[in-house]
Swiss-Prot record:
The protein, known as: tRNA-2-methylthio-N(6)-dimethylallyladenosine synthase
Function recorded in the entry: Catalyzes the methylthiolation of N6-(dimethylallyl)adenosine (i(6)A), leading to the formation of 2-methylthio-N6-(dimethylallyl)adenosine (ms(2)i(6)A) at position 37 in tRNAs that read codons beginning with uridine.
CDD domains reported for this sequence: Radical_SAM (cd01335)
Biological source species: Nitrobacter winogradskyi (strain ATCC 25391 / DSM 10237 / CIP 104748 / NCIMB 11846 / Nb-255)
GO MF term list: 4 iron, 4 sulfur cluster binding; metal ion binding; N6-isopentenyladenosine methylthiotransferase activity
Domain Radical SAM core: 156-386
Length: 477
């Protein structure tokens, strides 16, 4: 008789927050693929559901508990159907609230922090034996040394853009931020390991790499010479890997912008002229209260250094309004800084106190009404700058890396150097190619145009055109 085979078990991962979580979700899927799990888009049909969580803002945490309430019903239904469902809470909420999650959501089987994903198979086995498993320590061993490499099929299914973690953790201890407590101290991967990952991705059709870390430009991984390499030197090394046509990185800290990074933007065509450089506030008084350890003028000087090296460079940033003690004068300084820099995009949020951070104990709170008013005012200014920046593309011919099929039949979508979505009518054979597009119109934040030259023959993409890495802020900088 032929040997019977167990059907594959179904895995559903829902990620919240930054692109580090997107990368972590992929590595968890790779780890569990070895155990016979295949991904599904339906949580209700899954044998294993993982919530990969974010702890940056209060609402993000509460969303997790709301989702767990929904999953409890799905788990009960699975039991009535005669099958099991395991629920895992991973990520930064797991790290920060481990025991509290078990108390509030007893249907959870495993709680695992972001440094222990490689232990998922063992934790699931422990939960089966003991009822549940929790692991939120910061292990001494490097988790990356234990995570399996993604299969060729997995790489190709994820698109022509990919994230690669090169640095994790944060030593800055901004007073509003939980990242040092949930991700641990700054640690950098060795140059050789990063190069190995990028080569493997390039060999399987990836064309664009986004290097990620909580403070990515604090990178100091060991080079082949046995010495720590600065981030800029790593970029020079990766730019020489065949097949990689675009390099990006996020998130940066103004204090860690060193000369080799500036030089890389001057010298490397593959390094995109778009930098996410969070500043959080334009007020020196508030920056000091945040423990940012730089002034608004320090930030302006960093921007000037980038622009001198690469005149076509553009910037995005993060801002917090309503930080404890923020006055109208402090907020006016933020508006002034935004007006002086001129951003292509930015992310702005109302201050959200996080338990365990120094700012959560500060007494000079700002009213909700004032925070709401300031957020609207700041976002209106940022939106006007982004619209003005996008209008500069009208009538111009710009390079676009095409990465997926559009929503409309016959439409292909790519991204410019500045991450603007660009839509053209074309065959999906152009996916994976960088082609010039003449921009004819704008719609909200997207560009629409026509190909200015014929696609390269014989270079169709082998990817399922499901989209690749997209820009979000990585918490920590």
């Amino acid at each position: 008789m032929p040997e019977s085979r167990m059907p594959p078990r179904k895995l559903h991962i829902k990620s919240y927050g930054c692109q580090m979580n997107v990368y972590d979700a992929q590595r968890m899927a790779d780890t569990l693929a070895v155990e016979g799990y295949v991904e599904t888009t339906s949580a209700e049909d899954a044998d294993l559901v993982i919530l990969n969580t974010c702890h940056i803002r209060e609402k993000a945490s509460e969303k997790v508990y709301s989702e767990l309430g929904r999953l409890r019903a799905a788990k009960d239904q699975a039991a009535r159907d005669g099958r099991g469902m395991n629920i895992v809470v991973a990520g930064c909420v797991a790290q920060a609230e481990g025991e509290e999650i078990i108390r509030r959501a007893p249907m959870v089987d495993v709680v695992v922090g972001p440094q222990s994903y490689h232990h998922l198979p063992q934790l699931l086995a422990r939960a089966k034996t003991c009822g549940r498993a929790l692991e939120t320590e910061f292990p001494v061993a490097d988790k990356f040394g234990f995570l399996p490499q993604p299969s060729r099929q997995a790489i190709r299914s994820r698109g022509i853009s990919a994230f690669v973690t090169v640095q994790e953790g944060c030593d800055k201890f901004c007073t509003f931020c939980v990242v040092p407590y949930t991700r641990g101290a700054e640690a950098s991967r060795p140059v050789a390991k990063v190069v190995e990952d990028v080569r493997r991705l390039a060999d399987n059709g990836v064309r664009e790499i986004t290097l990620i870390g909580q403070n990515v430009n604090a990178y100091h991984g060991e080079g082949p010479d046995g010495r720590p390499w600065p981030f800029g030197k790593l970029l020079y090394r990766l730019a020489g890997i065949p097949g990689i046509v675009r390099l990006r990185y996020s998130t940066s800290h103004p204090r860690d912008v060193e000369d080799t990074l500036i030089d890389a933007h001057r010298d490397l065509d593959a390094l995109m002229p778009f930098v996410h450089l969070p500043v959080q506030s334009g007020s020196d008084r508030i920056l000091a209260a945040m423990n940012r350890r730089h002034t608004a003028d320090d930030y302006r000087r960093v921007i000037d250094r980038f622009r001198q090296a690469r005149p076509d460079i553009a910037f995005s940033s993060d801002f917090i309004v309503g930080f404890p003690g923020e006055t109208e004068e402090d907020f006016a300084a933020t508006l002034a800084l935004v007006g002086q820099i001129g951003y292509a995009a930015a992310y702005s949020f109302k201050y959200s106190p996080r338990p365990g951070t120094p700012a959560a104990d500060m007494q000079e709170t700002v009213s909700t009404a004032d925070m709401d008013q300031r957020l609207v005012q700041l976002q209106n200014l940022i939106d006007s700058q982004q619209s003005a920046f996008n209008r500069t593309a009208l009538g111009r011919t710009i390079d676009v890396l095409f990465d997926r099929a559009g929503r409309k039949p016959g439409q292909i979508v790519g991204r410019t150097a500045y991450l603007q979505p660009a839509h053209v009518e074309a065959s999906d054979a152009i996916i994976g190619q960088v082609l010039p597009v003449t921009v004819a119109s704008l719609e909200r934040y997207s560009l629409f145009g026509t190909l200015a030259s014929k696609p390269t023959s014989g270079e169709p993409s082998n990817h399922a055109a499901t989209g690749g890495a997209q820009f979000q802020t990585t918490a920590g900088a």
